[in-house]
């Protein structure tokens, strides 16, 4: 060491270098695909996801004793991650916390979207069900039906996955209070005929299990749609391009009701391009990313 070199400055210099090394390592980790999403799952489901790790350049998470790889959004068992092209990605996206403007597509983009709809109808996408099945302990119909519960939500009896019991209890309590102070909400709830939950079925037109088949989704079904569109696929029988249907012509859930569900971990299908305005899906990992 040079005579008179201050030890404090040396320590500060070494500390700064170490901090830069940590920051650079963190940057590299965050830059790898899937890091944000894997961490969101771990934050949203701490009772099921034991740990996350970088292994062989891939973000992974562990449920019980099994590791699942990000695998370009497919979330595959470690032994199958090289086959990611055989499967569709699990829906993970930037969810808007306010009602987004309608999509405005030029003719080229519109043509691509029309072709995508045709392609999906001809060759339905198929997700690997292993991750959600293990996460929810609902890999088969029999296993799923051992995990569902019947409960009351806003005056209706609904069957859902047991993980939804607490958040839906809070939803019901908040809606009960809201209907006393908000006439629009009271009228909306009075206009419902049922709330549907668990239903072991596949997404319409695909080979993938619906989130209803895990008991993770509920549909608020009205007595009448009043001539409005609630679902993009139904709208296609009336309009050429479903995404152009203005909000005024869609059956809509009042914003205060949507906010109650969102506060408790649910995303609303009314904010999707492929809209489903009656549909709420328990996706706390998506809301975690939206609020980062």
Would you name each region that the model predicts?
Residues 1-3, 9-12:
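Gram-negative bacterial Sec-dependent N-terminal signal peptides
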Residues 10, 14-141, 145:
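N-terminal accessory beta-strand-rich subdomains and adjacent acidic, glycine-rich linkers
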Residues 20-25, 29-30, 34-45, 57-72, ...:
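Catalytic cores and adjacent binding grooves of peptidoglycan-active enzymes
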Residues 80-94, 98-105, 171, 175, ...:
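Generic hydrophobic secondary-structure signal
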Residues 112, 151, 155, 200, ...:
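General secondary-structure edge motif
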Residues 119-190:
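Active-site acidic/histidine clusters and adjacent loop/turn architecture
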Residues 185-201:
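Acidic, glycine-rich low-complexity/disordered segments
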């Amino acid at each position: 060491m040079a005579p008179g070199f201050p030890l404090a400055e040396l320590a500060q210099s070494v500390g700064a270098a170490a901090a830069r090394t940590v920051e650079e390592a963190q940057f590299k980790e965050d830059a790898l695909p899937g890091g944000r999403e894997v961490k969101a799952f771990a934050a949203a489901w701490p009772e099921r996801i034991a740990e996350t790790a970088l292994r062989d350049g891939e973000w992974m998470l562990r449920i019980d004793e099994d590791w699942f790889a990000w695998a370009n959004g497919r979330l595959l068992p470690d032994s199958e991650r090289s086959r990611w092209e055989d499967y569709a990605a699990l829906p993970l996206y930037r969810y808007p916390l306010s009602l987004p403007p309608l999509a405005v597509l030029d003719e080229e983009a519109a043509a691509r979207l029309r072709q995508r709809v045709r392609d999906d109808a001809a060759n339905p996408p198929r997700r690997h069900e292993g991750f959600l099945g293990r996460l929810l302990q609902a890999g088969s119909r029999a296993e799923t039906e051992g995990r569902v519960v019947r409960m009351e939500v806003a005056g209706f009896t609904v069957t859902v996955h047991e993980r939804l019991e607490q958040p839906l209890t809070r939803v019901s309590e908040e809606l009960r209070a809201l209907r006393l102070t908000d006439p629009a909400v009271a009228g909306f709830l009075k206009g419902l005929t049922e709330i549907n939950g668990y239903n072991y079925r596949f997404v319409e037109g695909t080979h993938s299990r619906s989130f209803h088949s895990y008991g993770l989704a509920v549909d608020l079904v009205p007595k009448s749609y009043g001539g409005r569109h609630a679902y993009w696929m139904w709208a296609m029988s009336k309009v050429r391009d479903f995404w152009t249907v203005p909000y005024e012509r869609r059956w809509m859930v009042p914003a205060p009701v949507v906010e109650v569900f969102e506060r408790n971990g649910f995303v609303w299908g009314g904010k999707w391009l492929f809209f489903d305005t009656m549909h709420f899906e328990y996706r706390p990992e998506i809301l975690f990313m939206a609020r980062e």
